[in-house]
Amino acid sequence: MLEKEREKFLEDKFQAFVKNYALTNREQDVLRLLLSSDESVQVIAEQLYISRAALYRYMASLNEKTETKSRIGLLQFYYSWKQP
């Protein structure tokens, strides 16, 4: 039961973050993979069936919306973010 509650909490946080920062569907896909994987940009791009350049554009958009400057900064920001 605890695992289901944890999953619900994490999904609720993700959805609140998405809403708060007005993320597009593709930005959500990118963020989910960045959160769940420490793979290289090339591998993540392949998993999303997009080019590395496209992935970098989505990451830049996420950084702009969250006022972060890097992949690591984005992840740190997400994990420390508190729902308003």
Regions found by a protein language model. Name each.
Residues 3-4, 17, 60-84:
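Basic, Lys/Arg-enriched C-terminal extension of HTH/homeodomain DNA-binding domains
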Residues 6-11, 36, 53-54:
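Short acidic alpha-helix initiation/capping motifs at coil-to-helix transition points
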Residues 6-26:
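Regulatory hinge/linker segments at domain boundaries
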Residues 26-27, 41:
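The N-cap/first-turn positions of alpha helices
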Residues 28-32, 73:
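Pre-recognition alpha-helix immediately N-terminal to the DNA-recognition helix
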Residues 34-38, 78:
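Short helix-to-turn junction characteristic of helix-turn-helix DNA-binding domains
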